[in-house]
Amino acid sequence: MQVRIFLSWCHRNADLKKALLADLLPVLGIFTDLEVEWWEDSHLTCGEEFLPGILDRLDEADFGLLLLSTHYFASEFIRQHELPRFAGPAADRGSLPVALAPLPEFRAEHDLGGVERQLVFTSGSRSFAELSGHRRTTFANDLAGSIRRRALAENGYRSL
């Protein structure tokens, strides 16, 4: 099965994003039952219009991998153009929310665009940024497995 994933992230988290993808992308690439096509804004080409280029890729995506942080939720661009496609009442694409950095407690006084109603991927309630060494690799491996199960709709009942 083929799946298209749009990477939604805040540029202030570039180092964390790079570290996560260094371990995540190779694992996604070795699945035999899932072919992942990946897109992020760095794939825009010279002369391409920024906003239409991003909106077109959003339209083509099956899922959005949301790399969550306080900077992510504070980004006006993300809140206006990307997040509504993956969370909240107007969402029309699958969401794969990941705690890239520590997040505020999901409380009524925080506007998290609907993500607060979704299961956010963590490692034992810890974000990727809170881990180091082999624990980061394990985080990426487990995230790849979670992405695979969601893409293949293997999130239902299981035999005992």
PLM region spans:
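Alpha-helix termini
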Residues: 25-33, 88-92, 154-158
